[in-house]
Amino acid sequence: VRVVAGSVGGRTLRSPAGTTTRPTEERVRAALFDRLGDAVAGVGVIDPYAGSGALGIEALSRGAGRAVFVEVAPAALRALRRNVGDLGLEARARVLAEPARRALDRLAREGARFELALIDPPYALPWSQALDGLACVLAPGAWVVVERAARDPAPAHSPGLRPWRRARYGEVELSFWRYGQDEEDAADAGDLPRYV
């Protein structure tokens, strides 16, 4: 697995052996960040199911200002910390070794706000649980990108999130959302996504 583009583009990322952690494929990461374009520049990123850090590291490589990575699996956590260190990203990266909800609560208490959330939870985790607590750390207008198995049901509407676009890449689907819409906008959001 390599970083696709940016300041550390082409560099190899460590990944734990086995099938527990599945880093986002390079072509999917490329498509995700191509869609976001300049929206990544200078932003704060939260990666609450970081695994080896492929998504958040790609964001940092493409100009994100800072990233918080959250991971609990020991092998993935070791790979994540080594990736951040090997790529010289320590000054802009923070790694929290705790469950996602606990980390989000901690960040909310600290007053942290993020303009980009990269959500790639274990496929078995229910969506309501995967997004639980996320709104507490999102800045108004934040992008939320959710990766899931394309065969699974699409994420249900979540208060404050307005769907923008979905895109399928083989067995993976990405859903792009914007945060900070009022309830009326959110309720009317069904016809807003442009599916490509």
Regions found by a protein language model. Name each.
Residues V1-V196:
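Class I S-adenosyl-L-methionine-dependent methyltransferase catalytic core
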